[in-house]
Amino acid sequence: MKDTVGITALVPPELIYACGKRPLDVNNVVPGSSSSPASKLCAWTAVWRDMILSGELDIDSLVVVAGGDCHNALVDGQKAELSGKPTHYFFYPFDGDTDYFRSQLEKLSLFLGGVQDDGIITRITDLKSRGKALDEQRVNDRARASDVFSALISFSDLAGDLDAFERTLDSIPEADVEYTSRVALIGVPPIYPDFHEVAEGFGLHIVYDELPYEFIRLGGCDLDSLARNYTKYSFAGPIETRVWFIQDELRQRRVDGVIHYTQFACHHTLEDEIFRQHLDYPILTVQGDLPRPSSEQLKLRLEAFAEMLEVMP
């Protein structure tokens, strides 16, 4: 059985699979948890940290994205390392330096034991093409946002099993989507497992999930192309570049409004003011904490936002 490599944020899954390992995005188990960590800032990292320390999350090693995304993961990842878990620290360059990032990929490859099957990258590229087609179906009102989101969020690790993941993609149905407004969801993904279904219930069709879209947008066929493409990971670079990219997606997807999800104790919360200054759309900002079903307060806010968008000219 292949060794399981936990990843704390986006790490090119192409390279992990090519090294003969099985990636597991530790964040993807968090929304389904009922945990209430005693020691936490961000619940996302605290939940997976406790699951690793207790053995509930069975991984052979851990890759911590220590530069270019989540800051809390750096400390919680070190706690996992101090418990004896083999751990590697992975850094995205803020300035997009391709040579630097290629060196990061080379170091990661060494940690993982070296490339064994680079041909598997072609299959991952094909699966990502299917993900893009699925995303396009959603934009064209031919797939439910909740179905598409559950698929796209899994592209960070392709569910650790390419065959099973392909079957999952096969099972997503086409649907005629009825809604009152088209919205974008920016920021980190909601920690609430039912968020998309709740939004759909109020007539909000989420046609853009910012972070999961990065998982299918970026790719490559070898170290050089992976380095070139993944340095464009929007969450790891200047906020100005990210705003420009979001603006372009909002225009193409013809959105009526924007939901900015923020996580308690996450540095990305500080970006809300910037988005409000530069995105010329009605914006609803919501903040989550623990992994739980959507609260009644959140439902009321989503309902009010939907009603406001419906009456806007």
Residue map of PLM features:
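Trp/Phe/Arg-rich N-terminal binding region typifying the photolyase-homology
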Residues: 1-120, 196-199, 207-313
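A charged, amphipathic alpha-helical module
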Residues: 2-3, 106-219, 235
